Amino acid sequence: MRYEPVIGLELHIQLNTHSKLFSPSSAAFGAEANTHVNEIDLAYPGVLPVLNEQALASAVLFGLALGSRIHSSAVFMRKNYFYPDSPKGYQISQLNDAVILGGQVSIDVDGATQTVRINRGQLEEDAGKSVHDIFSDRTGIDLNRAGVPLIELVSEPDMHSAAAAVAYMRKIHHLVRYLGISDGNMQEGSFRCDANVSIRPVGSKELNARVELKNINSFRFVAQAIQIEIERQSDILDAGGSVEQETRLFDPEKMQTRTMRSKENANDYRYFPDPDLLPLHLSAETIEHIRAQLPELPDARAQRYRKDYQLDDETIAFLVQTRMIADYFDAVVAKCHDAKLAANWISVELARLLNEHHLSFEQNPVSAEQFSQLLLKIHDDTISAQNGKKVLDYLWQHADADVDAVIDTQGLRQISDDQALKTWAAEVLAAYPKQVADYRGGQEKLLGFFVGQVMKKSRGKANPKTVNDIISQMLQAE
């Protein structure tokens, strides 16, 4: 029998605030175990949580970017469970009255556009970590992560393949990094995924028992885990069995999923409103103030670049991968007025230098002002593209350098004086009579050879386009 997978994802997105969600302890990653904790994180009697306003603002910004409804009276709930890395015995989370309600994103899968609906995005605190590799006979507990702010983004079960799930996950990962609300570092646990997977006969609309795949920490593992789970469930149904609702772990070494525990329902967690935290009161003015901070989003920017500048998809993908790159590109285009030239030089030449020096775009030492001035000099033929690379290399090493001064001190200004170029061209044609005869005999590719010889005479300073025109005219005239 043929089956259709039904997949929903729960993405756990750590917010990059300085402090935790309900305490002033540092939320920074990588400190010595149990050094970023205080009385609130340790659940001392009598302490009270205080909401981190920046975390709330980040959640609202994210919801607006998703086209969600912002719940102005969202409620914090206690999710009760016993686990050693949660000192309180409960997690402060949200449920149906979450701050982010609804919304959707578009994804591209195998050349087709699909829509994935958002169920909700809940603002909650992260748990601590159980550490198994320090002690031989015990498990350690590190509470540095306990209380770090998270958004748990719950999708509707709108995905029907591992490829669609990964495309959705990548889309959200890109968005949170673009907005600057999370670093999305999967190795450090800043972006984690739980996948809910079920299957049903093709054509059926009934939702069957789902299996939750827990804490998958890479795009590749998400694809593998979902595909393996789809095959496992298919084998069970083909053998006449039934799939049990449970939580399973993915083992990437054995390429299999294994039972972790039976899957809990909401009632098992005994949710109730946290009595220490009043419902939120987000005014319309507050929401609009945050909306005003929303940048032009990646999809809108990509559409504009495609429509206004006719850029190709690969170049657009490079430009919108971060907000900083897109802002830089827009600033350069505003001054040099040549979008295709700017896009090419940013995505090729500037990217080359960043890669060679193992730097991110945030560490780019060349200002948009310098870069636009460089492109203006290339655009108006003051310098050749080849010498433009030399200027860029110099700017990379000298952050305060002036483009005009670099061109003059390095002697890179192009020679466009017709008389000088005609003299060199005549000398070249006189020096290569055989090649001239061959050209006139039909070997027109030799034109590039003649241009190259003039460029040598000028030490690379001649304007190659002008040289090309002059030599063509000379060859036709004679």
Swiss-Prot record:
NCBIfam families: gatB, PRK05477.1-2, PRK05477.1-4
UniProt KW Ligase keyword: yes
Biological-process GO terms, alphabetical: glutaminyl-tRNAGln biosynthesis via transamidation; translation
Family according to the record: Belongs to the GatB/GatE family. GatB subfamily.
E.C. code: 6.3.5.-
Principal EC category: ligase
Keyword field: ATP-binding, Ligase, Nucleotide-binding, Protein biosynthesis
Protein's job: Allows the formation of correctly charged Asn-tRNA(Asn) or Gln-tRNA(Gln) through the transamidation of misacylated Asp-tRNA(Asn) or Glu-tRNA(Gln) in organisms which lack either or both of asparaginyl-tRNA or glutaminyl-tRNA synthetases. The reaction takes place in the presence of glutamine and ATP through an activated phospho-Asp-tRNA(Asn) or phospho-Glu-tRNA(Gln).
Catalyzed chemical reaction(s): L-glutamyl-tRNA(Gln) + L-glutamine + ATP + H2O = L-glutaminyl-tRNA(Gln) + L-glutamate + ADP + phosphate + H(+); L-aspartyl-tRNA(Asn) + L-glutamine + ATP + H2O = L-asparaginyl-tRNA(Asn) + L-glutamate + ADP + phosphate + 2 H(+)
Assembly, per entry: Heterotrimer of A, B and C subunits.
SMART domains found in the cross-reference section: GatB_Yqey
Protein name according to UniProt: Aspartyl/glutamyl-tRNA(Asn/Gln) amidotransferase subunit B
Entry's Gene Ontology molecular function annotations: asparaginyl-tRNA synthase (glutamine-hydrolyzing) activity; ATP binding; glutaminyl-tRNA synthase (glutamine-hydrolyzing) activity
Short name of one Pfam family: GatB_N
Top-level taxon of the source organism: Bacteria
Gene name of the encoded protein: gatB
